[in-house]
């Protein structure tokens, strides 16, 4: 094996400081996103109040779809995440194709920044939508230049704040639960077909844990932790959504 290949596969120059809970924060943060806001209404239209079941089924669908990555990351450390997996099994040509596709899809970061700005504008009336979006992108870019430790701390704080907020929202909502919530007239309104359609939609809202594979090179024990994180974060978030 050439020295260049050794350098590409070696992680001896990386800190490898990310433990299970650091990776879990990445997994949860990657799953929870705009899908829960934009698709839940469509799911309710398909299956009514059995949407809670659709979320759990959707989580299982997401795990099944990502099972190849779960299995692959249980046997080896892939320093470049998906890029390394593509390069290992398909060769340099397809690795280049993957890189070009990844570059094109990275423009969606601007969409996330603009969505953040939409939520932040009521609290920051002195700033425009574009300036807030540019500011958050710049802040996150600068954070990443300080290394993986800074990234992990910011990610952990963000996910803790996110989970606390959603927990409060869920707890308050459960106290206002209608006693007739599971009334057959409003449950599985379009039968098993409607439940399946809603589950497929909800699988998108429960997807995203695969991005934790990008942290393989910086993980302490990726073959143990990454598969567990992908499983537990997906199932945990899907059950949480169902509540």
Sequence positions of predicted segments:
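Lipid-exposed faces of alpha-helical membrane segments in multi-pass integral membrane proteins
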Residues: 28, 32, 53, 57-61, ...
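Short helix-kink/termination motifs in transmembrane helices of multi-pass secondary transporters
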Residues: 28-39, 107-111, 203-210, 242-243
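Hydrophobic transmembrane alpha-helices that form the core helical bundles
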Residues: 42-46, 54, 63-145, 150
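Membrane-interface "cap" regions at the ends of multi-pass membrane proteins
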Residues: 1-41, 45-50, 62-67
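Select transmembrane alpha-helical segments in multipass membrane proteins
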Residues: 16-27, 91-103, 132-136, 189-202, ...
């Amino acid at each position: 094996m050439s020295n260049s290949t050794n350098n590409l596969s070696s992680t001896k120059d990386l800190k490898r400081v990310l433990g299970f809970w650091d990776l879990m924060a990445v997994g949860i943060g990657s799953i929870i996103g705009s899908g829960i806001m934009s698709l839940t209404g469509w799911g309710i239209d398909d299956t009514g109040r059995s949407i809670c079941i659709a979320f759990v089924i959707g989580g299982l669908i997401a795990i099944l779809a990502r099972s190849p990555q779960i299995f692959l990351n249980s046997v080896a450390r892939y320093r470049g995440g998906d890029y390394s997996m593509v390069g290992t099994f398909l060769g340099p040509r397809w690795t280049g194709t993957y890189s070009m596709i990844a570059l094109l899809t990275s423009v969606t970061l601007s969409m996330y920044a603009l969505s953040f700005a939409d939520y932040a504008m009521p609290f920051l009336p002195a700033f425009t939508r574009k300036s807030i979006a540019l500011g958050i992108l710049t802040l996150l870019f600068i954070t990443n230049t300080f290394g993986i430790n800074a990234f992990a701390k910011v990610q952990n704080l963000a996910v803790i704040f996110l989970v606390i907020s959603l927990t409060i929202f869920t707890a308050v909502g459960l106290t206002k639960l209608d006693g007739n919530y599971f009334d057959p007239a409003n449950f599985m309104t379009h039968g098993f077909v409607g439940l399946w359609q809603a589950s497929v939609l909800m699988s998108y809202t429960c997807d995203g844990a695969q991005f934790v594979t990008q942290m393989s090179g910086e993980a302490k024990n990726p073959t143990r932790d990454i598969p567990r994180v992908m499983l537990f974060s997906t199932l945990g978030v899907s059950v949480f959504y169902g509540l």
